[in-house]
């Protein structure tokens, strides 16, 4: 198995709220070595959600680098993502890292790849990893046909992905950012 794809990370945005979640399974080839890994983190003053699919050590390196870019760009998600991919493409060590990041703040959701891609997917849904397509399909259906909030959609979609993808389990970590309602005067 290519470690690059062995997980499911999903982010859903609706209204003034965004949720990002992932499963907890870590595999080494065809063996489950951990069922409760935490692949989703809060970065930059708790204002950015990030999840990874890929090699665990590589992902921690990328989280650290990305948080540094967020600090450098004062929390500007898009500028930090572009800066990270520039380094990722050109640095000899970073170029070998096998991971993808799904990141979101209150305004934007992105996929960041080692190929230098910074993608803002349609419909406010980001999905990466081996179960990503299953989770994305479920989330699109839930977004279109229910009034569920983002956290509930992420949970239900990850459950569906876990039922279908052998590299995804039912141990979920879900983080949520809510933009407070503007104060009316």
Curated annotation (Swiss-Prot):
> Which residues are annotated as active site?
7
One GO MF term, please?
threonine-type endopeptidase activity
Q: Which residues bind Na(+)?
A: 162, 165, 168
Q: What is its EC number?
A: 3.4.25.2
One biological process term in Gene Ontology: proteolysis involved in protein catabolic process
GO CC terms, sorted: HslUV protease complex; proteasome core complex
Is Cytoplasm one of the keywords? yes
Similarity-based family: Belongs to the peptidase T1B family. HslV subfamily.
NCBIfam families, alphabetized: ATP_dep_HslV, PRK05456.1
State the protein's name. ATP-dependent protease subunit HslV
According to its UniProt entry, this protein's organism is: Methylibium petroleiphilum (strain ATCC BAA-1232 / LMG 22953 / PM1)
**What lineage does the source organism belong to?**
Bacteria, Pseudomonadati, Pseudomonadota, Betaproteobacteria, Burkholderiales
């Amino acid at each position: 198995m290519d470690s690059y794809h062995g997980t499911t990370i999903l982010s859903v945005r609706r209204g003034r709220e965004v949720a990002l979640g992932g499963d907890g399974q870590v595999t080494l080839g065809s063996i489950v070595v951990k069922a409760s890994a935490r692949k989703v983190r809060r970065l930059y003053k708790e204002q950015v959600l990030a999840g990874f699919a890929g090699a665990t050590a590589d992902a921690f390196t990328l989280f650290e680098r990305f948080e540094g870019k967020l600090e450098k760009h004062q929390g500007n998600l898009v500028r930090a993502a572009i800066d990270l991919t520039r380094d990722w493409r050109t640095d000899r060590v970073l170029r070998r890292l096998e991971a993808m990041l799904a990141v979101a703040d209150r305004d934007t959701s992105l996929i960041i790849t080692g190929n230098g891609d910074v993608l803002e997917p349609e419909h406010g849904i980001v999905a990466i990893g081996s179960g990503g397509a299953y989770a994305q399909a479920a989330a699109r259906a839930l977004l279109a046909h229910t009034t569920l909030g983002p956290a509930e959609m992420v949970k239900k979609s990850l459950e569906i992905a876990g039922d279908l993808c052998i590299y995804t389990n039912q141990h979920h970590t879900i983080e949520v950012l809510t933009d407070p309602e503007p104060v009316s005067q």
